[in-house]
Regions:
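Soluble "head" domains of membrane/secretory-pathway proteins
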Residues: 3-135
Length: 135
C-alpha cells in the first residue's frame, strides 16, 4: 500500500456492520493462501464489472474509469484470470503500489471472500507525525 501506508504503521480498523465499498482500505485475514493478514484497497465488489487496461494503465468499474490519485506505480499484469463480473460474496482488491503488490491479480491472493475481511482501516495512529483518517 506504499505510499498510502507503510509497514509497521498502526491502524484503527472497524468491522461493526461493515459492507465493503469501492476505494475502501481493508484488512483481510490470511484466508487459505496467505500466512498473515494483508491490507489492500477494494477495487470492485460483487456484481460490478471490472476491466483493467494494462496498456493504458486504467481501471474501469461498471464501465467508468476510476480516479486513483493514490496509485504510486504502474499496473502490471498478474497470473490470475480477472473476472469480467465480480461473483457474489467476493471482492477484487489491489495495493496502491501496483508494480509489486501481491493482490487479486495473483493466484496466491485472488478474489477475496467477504467473510475474510477483518474490517475497514479507518485511522492511522502511529507514527505520530502521520496520525489521521485514511481515505
Amino acid at each position: 500500500m506504499k505510499n498510502t501506508l507503510l509497514n509497521d504503521e498502526k491502524l484503527i480498523v472497524t468491522s461493526f456492520m461493515y459492507t465493503p465499498a469501492d476505494g475502501d482500505i481493508v484488512v483481510i485475514s490470511h484466508g487459505q493462501h496467505l500466512d498473515e493478514p494483508i491490507v489492500k484497497r477494494v477495487i470492485a465488489t460483487e456484481g460490478q464489472t471490472l476491466k483493467i487496461d494494462f496498456d493504458r494503465q486504467q481501471v474501469y468499474v461498471d464501465g467508468k474509469q476510476i480516479d486513483e490519485p493514490y496509485v504510486s506505480s504502474e499496473i502490471v499484469q498478474g497470473d490470475s484470470v480477472i473476472p469480467e463480473i465480480i461473483p457474489e460474496g467476493k471482492i477484487f482488491v489491489m495495493g496502491d503500489n501496483r508494480a509489486i503488490s501481491n493482490d487479486s491479480r495473483y493466484n496466491q491472493v485472488g478474489l477475496i471472500d467477504v467473510d475474510d475481511i477483518i474490517g475497514k482501516a479507518q485511522f492511522r495512529v502511529l507514527p505520530i507525525n502521520k496520525i489521521g483518517y485514511l481515505y
